[in-house]
């Protein structure tokens, strides 16, 4: 794959082994089956798939590993899994089951050495650090939030981004909490700022509503665009999106 090609990544929330936020594909026998949904996205031209495990039980790991094994047998594009990864053993179990990358968020803030240890053990290319950021009230910048956006850490986004990079993260998945769910576009100022700060791939998340929004994210320095609703509800077809991006001079894999 062209390393300069921009990537389109549908994100699926998984709860107790099922896809939540219904996926509106015609002809799917079971829209809650992660394997079936992943297979369809693979056929439709997604470059990668991200799974976020939102199950709040300790049984989550076994269920998620079963899903990863089943998906990896059927789907040959990279698979990233996040949610509840707190230690190296969790990373090992998921990577061993067949996922390509693991995504850590709150656990990286609580134990930053997890980034170094994961990168050293499995390679930076396997470690994605997800960051949820929100504008400060005085608009002087952004703070990092954890626990699904419920807790303001008081940590500055730029400082944390630099630390994550220096500790060996291979990619950063940046969610703008201000833009998330608005369908009014990604936070392009945030993307521009971070893309100048570090030279690892930046995945934009939060705010996509149109093809133009995704183009703007790429022009603002994002290497990949992640979205859920617009793809799940077929508001945007991935191949149509890629043809549009290519017509606008943005390199994508068709």
UniProtKB/Swiss-Prot annotation:
Annotated active site: 13, 132
First-listed, main subcellular location of the protein, grouped into a coarse class: cytoplasm
E.C. numbers: 4.3.2.10
Catalysis performed (reactions): 5-[(5-phospho-1-deoxy-D-ribulos-1-ylimino)methylamino]-1-(5-phospho-beta-D-ribosyl)imidazole-4-carboxamide + L-glutamine = D-erythro-1-(imidazol-4-yl)glycerol 3-phosphate + 5-amino-1-(5-phospho-beta-D-ribosyl)imidazole-4-carboxamide + L-glutamate + H(+)
Pfam family, one: His_biosynth
Protein's pathway: Amino-acid biosynthesis; L-histidine biosynthesis; L-histidine from 5-phospho-alpha-D-ribose 1-diphosphate: step 5/9
Cysteines joined through disulfide linkages: none
Entry GO MF terms: imidazoleglycerol-phosphate synthase activity; lyase activity
Compartments where found: Cytoplasm
First-level EC class: lyase
Keywords: Amino-acid biosynthesis, Cytoplasm, Histidine biosynthesis, Lyase
GO biological process, alphabetically ordered: L-histidine biosynthetic process
TM region positions: none
GO cellular component, one term: cytoplasm
Family membership noted in the UniProt record: Belongs to the HisA/HisF family.
Function: IGPS catalyzes the conversion of PRFAR and glutamine to IGP, AICAR and glutamate. The HisF subunit catalyzes the cyclization activity that produces IGP and AICAR from PRFAR using the ammonia provided by the HisH subunit.
Subunit relationships: Heterodimer of HisH and HisF.
Protein name: Imidazole glycerol phosphate synthase subunit HisF
Organism of this sequence: Wolinella succinogenes (strain ATCC 29543 / DSM 1740 / CCUG 13145 / JCM 31913 / LMG 7466 / NCTC 11488 / FDC 602W)
